[in-house]
């Protein structure tokens, strides 16, 4: 007999609980429970036995396509200690280097796409994504070369530790599910020391897998943790 999976939607200080029906995804079950609420459920913590979602009309988190006009913000975010520690392999965070690195992604001349995260209309961070198979050397290190890879950063330090990480990744998941309807899995590979990032991934439904060494631009390697999300199970 299949294990019963419980879903809880938090809204306005109260919890609404139910169970997943048959082949229903976790997201679909949350939407069903939240049908009468004023807002869409977002993942709060999907790492436990109960899959917990939240409806918070006061926090609107979304993504928009990055433009070259965003690059000064990206350079400022990249220069912040809490970001640069994990993004140093992308080069110096000065504007010229950032423009050289990300400009082609913005222009659409590479397989990578860039997104700006907005919280209540304010730009607060960025996300980049790509199909792993478009970068064969990296894809060989991963369990599913056709997965969609993602990297992300909260740029504004004031938003760190406020629950934005899971909200921005959830917004990315929903958008990417429609952009890549054939993708069975999504993939992220944070540095093994980046415990905050690993925890955020768990909260939105990723599971940790193989540790592997990712070559860096300076000839060294970084030990990362491959994290995979089952699109059908989590999003439907």
Report residues per predicted region:
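Acyl-donor (CoA/ACP) binding surface of acyl/acetyltransferases
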Residues: 1-3, 9-14, 19-22, 26-59, ...
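Residue-level detector of secondary-structure transition/capping positions
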Residues: 34-37, 82, 91, 106
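Residues that form generic nucleotide/phosphate-binding pockets
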Residues: 36, 77, 86, 101-105
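Residue-level detector of short, conserved catalytic/binding motifs and their immediate flanks
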Residues: 61, 113-115, 148
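Hydrophobic alpha-helical core bundles mediating ligand binding, dimerization, or RNAP-core interactions
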Residues: 74-78, 98, 102, 150, ...
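Helix-loop element at the rim of GNAT/NAT acetyltransferase active sites that forms part
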Residues: 76-93
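Active-site rim helix/loop that mediates acceptor-substrate recognition in acyltransferases
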Residues: 91-114, 119
């Amino acid at each position: 007999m299949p294990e019963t999976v419980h879903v809880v939607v938090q809204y306005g200080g109260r919890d609404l609980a139910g169970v997943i029906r048959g082949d229903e995804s976790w997201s679909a079950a949350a939407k069903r429970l939240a049908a009468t609420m004023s807002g869409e459920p977002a993942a709060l913590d999907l790492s436990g036995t109960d899959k917990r979602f939240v409806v918070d009309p006061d926090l609107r988190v979304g993504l928009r396509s990055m433009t070259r006009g965003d690059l000064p913000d990206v350079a400022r975010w990249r220069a912040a200690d809490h970001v640069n520690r994990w993004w140093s392999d992308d080069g110096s965070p000065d504007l010229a280097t950032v423009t050289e690195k990300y400009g082609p992604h913005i222009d659409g001349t590479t397989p990578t796409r860039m997104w700006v995260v907005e919280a209540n209309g304010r730009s607060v961070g960025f996300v980049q994504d790509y199909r792993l198979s478009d970068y064969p050397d990296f894809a060989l290190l991963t369990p599913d070369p056709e997965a969609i890879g993602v990297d992300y950063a909260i740029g504004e330090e004031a938003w760190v530790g406020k629950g934005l990480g899971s909200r921005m990744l959830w917004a990315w998941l929903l958008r990417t599910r429609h952009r890549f309807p054939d993708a069975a899995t999504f993939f992220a590979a944070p540095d093994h020391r980046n415990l905050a990032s690993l925890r955020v991934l768990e909260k939105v439904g990723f599971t940790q897998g193989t540790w592997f060494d990712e070559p860096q631009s300076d000839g060294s390697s970084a030990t990362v943790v491959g994290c995979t999300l089952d699109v059908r199970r989590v999003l439907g």
